Amino acid sequence: MNPDNYLYLSALLFTIGAAGVLLRRNVIVVFMCVELMLNAANLAFVAFSRMHGQLDGQVVAFFTMVVAACEVVIGLAIIMTIYRARRSASVDDANLLKH
């Protein structure tokens, strides 16, 4: 399969994720859209590394997945803290943790 198709798919996934981050108010949906954007970047890294015959992009994608796993743990803990305090999962309630 042509590597350009993977790059087009990556751009489409990143655009969908960015639109979700900008347009949605629910923290869980925004969180999933950020993860979609990270996966789109991983797909682009792997496609570029495949095009050039090197493993650098795949190594970067692996480390990005490790960072994304840590982000999931910390992000869900923050979301649960906000939900317990306000019984809402809205982006507007994120300023609750300032105090």
Swiss-Prot record:
Gene3D superfamilies the record matches: 1.10.287.3510
Chain ranges passing through the membrane: 3-23, 28-48, 59-79
Enzyme class: translocase
Taxonomy, superkingdom: Bacteria
GO molecular function: NADH:ubiquinone reductase (non-electrogenic) activity; quinone binding
A Pfam family hit: Oxidored_q2
UniProt record, GO biological process: ATP synthesis coupled electron transport
GO terms for cellular component: NADH dehydrogenase complex; plasma membrane
Signal peptide (residue range): none
Keyword Cell membrane attached: yes
InterPro entries attached to this UniProt entry: NADH_UbQ_OxRdtase_chain4L/K (IPR001133), NUOK/Mnh_C1-like (IPR039428)
Subcellular location: Cell membrane
Catalytic activity reported: a quinone + NADH + 5 H(+)(in) = a quinol + NAD(+) + 4 H(+)(out)
E.C. code: 7.1.1.-
Topological category with respect to the lipid bilayer: Multi-pass membrane protein
Keywords from the named record: Cell membrane, Membrane, NAD, Quinone, Translocase, Transmembrane, Transmembrane helix, Transport
NCBIfam families hit by this protein: PRK05715.1-2, PRK05715.1-3, PRK05715.1-5
Family, per entry: Belongs to the complex I subunit 4L family.
PANTHER family xrefs: NADH DEHYDROGENASE SUBUNIT 4L-RELATED, NADH-UBIQUINONE OXIDOREDUCTASE SUBUNIT ND4L
Record text on subunit structure and interactions: NDH-1 is composed of 14 different subunits. Subunits NuoA, H, J, K, L, M, N constitute the membrane sector of the complex.
Chain's role: NDH-1 shuttles electrons from NADH, via FMN and iron-sulfur (Fe-S) centers, to quinones in the respiratory chain. The immediate electron acceptor for the enzyme in this species is believed to be a menaquinone. Couples the redox reaction to proton translocation (for every two electrons transferred, four hydrogen ions are translocated across the cytoplasmic membrane), and thus conserves the redox energy in a proton gradient.
Protein name per Swiss-Prot or TrEMBL: NADH-quinone oxidoreductase subunit K
